[in-house]
Structure formats: structure tokens, C-alpha cells
């Protein structure tokens, strides 16, 4: 009986690990799609990674901002053209799947531009919405 219980627990953990791995890969794909869109000066494509909702939270140097449209408008003001956008690079330091629909990501970003190379860190909360991972909370510094 103990052997059967151990086998069942092992199978469950294996399935959980596989599911988590699939979710982590899907999250990396969302972030990579954002990076590619950014580097093609496609701000709308970049915004596809965010939850299109008034409940989206973005925290940057201006403090908390709420909503997809407000976040998009702020990006347009700060990055009006390809030169301002530069080339985005990031390093993912940690992806933690909390459950099947929520995850946190910790990472480092770098913009390579002609005259400077600003950089910082980000913490993202992603949620699986209608089967797709979306950034619902972004704290970037």
C-alpha cells in the first residue's frame, strides 16, 4: 500500500513538474515576443504581452499607473521612435509558477541606444487569461 501511495505521489509530482515546465516555456515565449516587437519598434506588438484591462498595474519612476491604455500612452511619450526605444535585452533571473494560472518573473533589462544604455530590474506578475499568459502587474526600475 505504501509503495502504491509513493508511486501515485511521484506521478503527481512529475505531472506538476511537466505542467510547470510548459507554463514557464509559454511565459518565456510571451516575453520573447515582447522583446522582438520592441526591437522592431512595434509598440502595439509589445503591448500584446500585457493584459488589455483597466486593472493592469504598471509601476515605474512615476509611481503606480493603472490600465492598458495609460501604460501604452506612457510608453508612446517615453519612446516616440526607434532611436528612443533602442534595442531591448533582458535576462530572466527567476520564473516562479505559483499555481496553474499565476506566476512571478524577476529579471534584468537593458536598452542599448546610440548615446546611452539604461538598465534596471523588473518584477512581473503574469496570469493565464483565456489560456494565454499576460502581464497583469509590472514593476520596472
State what each model feature region is:
Residues 119-141:
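Short beta-strand edge/turn micro-motifs at domain boundaries
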Residues 62, 94, 108-109, 124, ...:
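A mature extracytoplasmic/lumenal domain signature
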Residues 1-4:
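Positively charged n-region of N-terminal signal peptides that target proteins for export
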Residues 53-66, 80-83:
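A short gly/proline-enriched turn/hairpin at secondary-structure junctions
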Residues 52, 98-99, 129:
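Structural motif
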Residues 70-114:
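Surface-exposed, charged secondary-structure patches
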Residues 34, 46-47, 55-56, 71, ...:
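Hydrophobic pocket/interface hotspot
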Residues 8-49:
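Short, low-complexity N-terminal intrinsically disordered segments enriched in polar/charged residues
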Amino acid at each position: 500500500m505504501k509503495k502504491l501511495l509513493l508511486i501515485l505521489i511521484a506521478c503527481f509530482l512529475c505531472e506538476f513538474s511537466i505542467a510547470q515546465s510548459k507554463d514557464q516555456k509559454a511565459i518565456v515565449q510571451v516575453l520573447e515576443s515582447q522583446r522582438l516587437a520592441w526591437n522592431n519598434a512595434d509598440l502595439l506588438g509589445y503591448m500584446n504581452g500585457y493584459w488589455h484591462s483597466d486593472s493592469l498595474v504598471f509601476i515605474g519612476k512615476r509611481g503606480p499607473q493603472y490600465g492598458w491604455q495609460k501604460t501604452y500612452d506612457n510608453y508612446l511619450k517615453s519612446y516616440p521612435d526607434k532611436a528612443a526605444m533602442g534595442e531591448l535585452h533582458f535576462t530572466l533571473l527567476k520564473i516562479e509558477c505559483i499555481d496553474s494560472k499565476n506566476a512571478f518573473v524577476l529579471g534584468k533589462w537593458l536598452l542599448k541606444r546610440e548615446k546611452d544604455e539604461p538598465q534596471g530590474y523588473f518584477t512581473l506578475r503574469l496570469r493565464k487569461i483565456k489560456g494565454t499568459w499576460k502581464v497583469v502587474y509590472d514593476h520596472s526600475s
